[in-house]
């Protein structure tokens, strides 16, 4: 298994003066400790139903991270494509690819928070179709000159975006999530989402998906690829999963959870009850968290992307000791690949 971490781009109160230096030190520390990648989240507005905080703009942040690292992949999980204009996005992606030496991963999705779509003149009901158009147009702009595109939402004539040729892998998010009143989506893998995932280079399972739901989604992905005459192995397809975690060194689950509740509810909204958090996120003692990681590997996850909930390098070192070191190179079951 590969392990990446999210840069601490949360806009926490009182952190304005130190934030840039925190991100720099965190990125450099993650590289030194051997993490495979640095990821960022995209929310144009504060999605108050799920989170207490907003985040820095992701692509600008990754350009900053590119300047202070040399090895880790740099990715989005996810970039909300319906809020992006494809010509501008192509220029941003091409620039990050140039500045990072080709380390960018475009983790993409439709988003879910309706005020964000409305703020840019869109609507939630258009998000799937807009996502497909943005992906198609952006990838064409990254590979060809003098591009003309006629879509329902985006159109341009004879556009050339340079530098050309630095096309990143595209990992598409979506699928089932916990069946609960606090979840923003239904617990299904929609056929349109399934087809979108299988068109590209990888899949990011929802952070709110339990291991059995990841397993079920992946079986559908495998079947869809087989119907198309291919497989994950043939495509070099990546199975990733995003999750939230605070590692506690306290003895006993109750003590560990008490610490985690305080830390997690500084970032995520308590509109989701703790039983929801425990059902989908990595909580409990270090041994509990390790069992949760193994359950996700057993479900087919190859690349785990973890939010550390903090810029504190001590958490990053705990992640390296208790997750990166014991699970690096651990593969999903052979019958799942």
Please report, for each region that a protein language model flagged, where it lies by residue.
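Active-site-adjacent structural elements that line small-molecule/cofactor binding pockets in enzymes
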Residues: 1-337
């Amino acid at each position: 298994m590969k392990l990446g971490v999210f840069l601490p781009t949360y806009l926490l109160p009182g952190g304005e003066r130190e934030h840039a230096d925190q991100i720099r030190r965190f990125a450099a520390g993650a590289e030194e400790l051997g993490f495979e990648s640095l990821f960022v989240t995209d929310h144009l507005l504060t999605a108050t139903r799920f989170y207490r905080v907003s985040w820095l703009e992701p692509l600008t942040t990754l350009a900053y991270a590119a300047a202070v690292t040399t090895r880790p992949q740099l990715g989005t999980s996810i970039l909300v494509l319906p809020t992006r204009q494809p010509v501008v996005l192509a220029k941003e992606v091409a620039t990050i690819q140039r500045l990072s030496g080709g380390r960018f991963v475009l983790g993409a999705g439709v988003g879910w928070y309706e005020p964000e779509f409305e703020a840019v003149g869109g609507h939630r009901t258009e998000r799937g179709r807009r996502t497909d158009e943005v992906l198609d147009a952006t990838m064409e702009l990254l590979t060809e000159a003098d591009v003309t595109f006629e879509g329902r939402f985006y159109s341009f004539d004879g556009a050339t975006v340079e530098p050309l040729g630095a096309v990143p892998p595209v990992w598409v998010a979506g699928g089932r999530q916990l069946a609960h009143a606090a979840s923003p989506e239904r617990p299904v893998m929609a056929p349109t989402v399934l087809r979108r995932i299988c068109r590209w280079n990888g899949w990011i399972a929802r952070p709110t998906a339990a291991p059995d739901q990841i397993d079920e989604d992946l079986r559908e992905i495998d079947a869809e690829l087989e119907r198309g005459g291919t497989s994950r192995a043939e495509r070099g397809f990546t199975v990733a999963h995003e999750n939230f975690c605070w590692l506690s060194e306290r003895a006993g689950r109750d003590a560990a959870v008490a610490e985690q509740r305080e830390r997690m509810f500084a970032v995520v909204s308590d509109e989701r009850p703790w039983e929801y958090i425990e059902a989908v996120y990595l909580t409990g003692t270090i041994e509990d968290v390790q069992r949760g990681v193994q359950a996700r590997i057993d479900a087919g996850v190859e690349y785990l992307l973890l939010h550390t909930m903090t810029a504190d390098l001590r958490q990053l070192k705990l992640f390296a000791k208790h997750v990166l070191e014991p699970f690096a190179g651990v593969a999903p079951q052979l019958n799942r690949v």
